[in-house]
Amino acid sequence: EPVTVKKTKWHHMDIKKHFEIINNNVRAGKSAQKFEIRHGECKKQDCKWGAQRTERHLKKLHYSSKKFKEPVFYALSIYIPEDFGYDFVASKMSLFQAKMKGVDMPLWMISTQGSGFQVRLGHYKRCHGFLFKKGSWNDFIVKTNYRRESIKSEKYFELWWNGVQIN
């Protein structure tokens, strides 16, 4: 059984209906996780408010074994179909985030915004205006350093999107 299944937490949604391990349309490796929520499947709310969208509960959990002295790298590839629209209704959805136990807000988060994405670093910094490349894979690599002391030559958070550093 793929490791990805063991690290995924489920809510009340039917696993067979909304999630599967696929072997086709895979970016890297032999398999991928596919999450799919169709219109109207958000607790009869028609997915109109982000807080009521149930895919927020389909989270891939990752617990890094790295020490806080070393940078931590994360990678995510997401396929955006050609018909991915600009519908602003319920267009905010977290794709990728890091949280600290006991802290409500994510340390950093990459989320959808219309037909693109935004990057948030806590409450204080936000990067806007990146449109997804439709009909293809969008690759994200995050390098972050959670150590307590700051070093002038090192950034706390660095992001590459499709091989280009954007911060």
What do these predicted ranges mean?
Residues 1-167:
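Low-complexity, Ser/Thr/Pro/Gly-rich disordered linker/stalk regions
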